[in-house]
């Protein structure tokens, strides 16, 4: 009789464990996340893969859509996610203010909303994970000032500043961080033109400005978008000289794409404020999981040993929690660091 009870209890325990394991699998399979991005190529593909891979490893289903840069299409896509009843929404906003329409609709439906790379403006989301774009602008600004000081013995000269889409928070921060440094030096003239993240617009800006005046440096909001076409345009204008030669135009940018790292190695460009692109998505997955688990999160420093983005800063702002991952100041001196996403 005792042996029968032991066997029965053991079988019941195994059945319970099996049932719990199936429940866990079902719970994971029931997590559906809608992911809306402007595109899924270049840096955006790296961001998406950084999210998709760990999400799918948890058994989550990821639904992805692209807007092609059309803010209204992005809103329509997100409304479709809401109608489908997804468990969370992740977006790379086309329009930082315009995205608030979708954020409000998701909130009314009880769906947590996260943004990557670019924050919302005018509404609160659960969290935004992004590079410290202001820091990146600072780093590029300091590099330009150092070059001008070395060239002229003091910080003076002319800088062409090609922005992204200034309706987006990320471009505003990249501009603000750079301006904060450059504006300290009254003898540096800055020519600022909006490039809207479009390579052809960047080319036209370079042609228009350099056809009528000389510049000492060019700062670009995205080397992924502008660097290769800018170098090619300088060659076509017969204004290209490699680093170290007379006439070299110093080129600084943000992102750290592989194409620009190659140009830095060649001496065509000089500095990049590298983003921890693949880590954006994985960090969002981590915080969505915390939300699903009912875990509270608190402001403060986030440290991960060995990560180039560490330490990061988690802050509560008027647009919700923001996790600012540090950018890496890249030059010819540290270009081969394997941790740089452009080297991966």
Locate the predicted segments by residue:
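Sec/Tat signal peptide C-region and signal peptidase I cleavage site
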Residues: 22-28
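Hydrophobic alpha-helical
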Residues: 88-108, 178, 195-263
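Hinge/cleft segment of the Venus flytrap/periplasmic-binding protein
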Residues: 31, 162-166, 170, 181-182, ...
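Bacterial N-terminal signal peptides
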Residues: 10-21
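Hinge/beta->alpha junction and helix N-cap segments in small-molecule ligand-binding domains
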Residues: 36-49, 64-73, 95, 118, ...
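Flexible loop/hinge segments that line or gate small-molecule binding clefts
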Residues: 97-135, 158, 257-263, 269-270
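Extracellular/periplasmic ligand-binding modules, especially the Venus flytrap/periplasmic-binding
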Residues: 221-229, 264-265, 271-296
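Bacterial N-terminal signal peptides that target proteins for export
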Residues: 1-11
């Amino acid at each position: 009789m005792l042996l029968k009870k032991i066997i029965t209890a053991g079988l019941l325990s195994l059945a319970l464990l099996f049932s719990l394991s199936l429940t866990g699998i079902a719970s994971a399979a029931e997590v559906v996340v809608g992911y809306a991005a402007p595109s899924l190529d270049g840096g955006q593909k790296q961001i998406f893969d950084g999210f998709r891979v760990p999400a799918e490893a948890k058994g989550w289903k990821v639904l992805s859509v692209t807007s092609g840069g059309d803010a209204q299409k992005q809103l329509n896509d997100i409304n479709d996610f809401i109608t489908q009843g997804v468990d969370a929404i992740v977006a790379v906003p086309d329009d930082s203010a315009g995205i608030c329409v979708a954020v409000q609709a998701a909130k009314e439906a009880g769906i947590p909303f996260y943004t990557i790379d670019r924050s919302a403006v005018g509404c609160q989301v659960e969290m935004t994970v992004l590079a410290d774009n202001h820091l990146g602008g600072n780093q590029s600004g300091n590099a330009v000032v150092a070059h001008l000081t070395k060239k002229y013995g003091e910080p003076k000269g002319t800088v062409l500043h090609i922005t992204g889409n200034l309706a987006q928070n990320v471009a505003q921060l990249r501009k603000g961080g750079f301006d904060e440094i450059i504006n300290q030096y009254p003898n540096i003239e800055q020519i600022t033109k909006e490039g809207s993240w479009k390579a052809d617009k960047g080319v036209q800006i370079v042609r228009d400005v350099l056809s009528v005046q000389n510049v000492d440096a060019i700062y670009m909001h995205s080397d992924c978008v502008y660097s290769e076409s800018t170098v090619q345009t300088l060659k076509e204008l017969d204004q290209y000289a490699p680093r170290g030669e007379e006439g070299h135009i110093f080129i600084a940018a943000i992102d750290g794409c592989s194409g620009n790292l190659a140009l830095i190695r060649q001496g065509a460009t000089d500095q990049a404020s590298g983003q921890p692109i693949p880590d954006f998505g994985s960090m969002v997955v981590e915080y969505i999981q915390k939300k699903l688990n009912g875990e509270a999160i608190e402001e403060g420093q986030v440290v991960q040993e060995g990560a180039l983005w560490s330490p990061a800063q988690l802050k509560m702002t008027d647009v919700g929690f923001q996790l600012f991952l540090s950018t890496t100041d890249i030059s010819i001196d540290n270009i081969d660091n394997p941790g740089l996403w452009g080297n991966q």
